[in-house]
């Protein structure tokens, strides 16, 4: 009998990936996180290229999770709380499409859940401006350079600009 859990992936962009990754790493049921880039047109982009805003990529975090321990809906709830989804192509002082608010879905079920979640958030009264989060199909995920992986954890805390 195979006891290995069936793991799933979720991918979120919510500004600087250092902060986003640190938040999701705290969640029980999250097995792994990876900082990287998605949503652009250049293969194997570097951090410098993504920051140039000429590759179309967003800084994202790929979240590998056990759905028996944490639901995708719970990950979405966390996503909405860790950034301001009303800021277009920025989070705080970090400006550019690479810092956009985006949910990349991996399955039709994730797409439906993301859209319902965004509709619920939009009607929650929490925001004075409309939500501008993009919801898009997951494309190639490119790992960020090693020094970006678990960046805040490795450096004993700190934060991004947001």
Swiss-Prot record:
Catalytic activity: L-methionyl-[protein] + [thioredoxin]-disulfide + H2O = L-methionyl-(S)-S-oxide-[protein] + [thioredoxin]-dithiol; [thioredoxin]-disulfide + L-methionine + H2O = L-methionine (S)-S-oxide + [thioredoxin]-dithiol
Active site: 16
GO function terms (MF aspect): L-methionine-(S)-S-oxide reductase activity; peptide-methionine (S)-S-oxide reductase activity
UniProtKB keywords: Oxidoreductase
BP term (GO), one: cellular response to oxidative stress
Function of the molecule: Has an important function as a repair enzyme for proteins that have been inactivated by oxidation. Catalyzes the reversible oxidation-reduction of methionine sulfoxide in proteins to methionine.
Family statement drawn from the similarity comment of this UniProt entry: Belongs to the MsrA Met sulfoxide reductase family.
The name this protein goes by in its record: Peptide methionine sulfoxide reductase MsrA
Species in which this protein is naturally found: Geobacter metallireducens (strain ATCC 53774 / DSM 7210 / GS-15)
């Amino acid at each position: 009998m195979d006891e290995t859990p069936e793991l799933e992936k979720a991918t979120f962009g919510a500004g600087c990936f250092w902060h986003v990754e640190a938040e999701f790493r705290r969640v029980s049921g999250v097995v792994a996180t990876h900082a990287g880039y998605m949503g652009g047109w250049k293969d194997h982009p570097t951090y410098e290229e993504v920051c140039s805003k000429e590759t179309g990529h967003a800084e994202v975090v790929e979240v590998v999770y056990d759905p028996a321990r944490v639901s995708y809906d719970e990950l979405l709830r966390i996503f909405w709380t860790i950034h301001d989804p009303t800021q277009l192509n920025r989070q705080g002082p970090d400006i550019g499409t690479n810092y956009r608010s985006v949910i990349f879905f991996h399955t039709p079920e994730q797409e439906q859940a993301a859209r319902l979640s965004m509709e619920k958030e939009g009607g929650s009264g929490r925001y004075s401006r409309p939500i501008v989060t993009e919801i898009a199909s997951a494309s190639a995920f490119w790992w960020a350079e090693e020094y970006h992986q678990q960046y805040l954890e490795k450096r004993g805390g700190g934060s991004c600009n947001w």
